[in-house]
């Protein structure tokens, strides 16, 4: 039920992982649903961004769907077509964290493609809201385990969750 927009923007069929002591990198391809790049949108918000990507790319498929680099424990750098997103986590307490998100675009997009920027950020925020719900559910589950005196992890679904074991 989570990530219908992102899940139809990227494909994990060619998911690649690279892991080091303090980082992990995931690279995923661009979805080719219905036989063409970005052929089906999972949500109206993502449809708007997919159309903006294809318009800016003049119908050509982007090289990658996304590259997600996590530098433990507080930095994530995400590459999507024509945008770099940097997220920095700031701990406010044991149960509270602020995520500072910055978006970087090529000059041509910033100067002349406001629709691209707005569509991309709306799609990104849609996925963020889904991620927040997942994180809250995980926190509730971990709290329930702690209250029972249990400490369990996994099972992990490979290859999608290989980074969780890292």
Q: What do the predicted segments below correspond to?
A:
Residues 1-166:
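C-terminal catalytic domain of Rieske-type non-heme iron oxygenases
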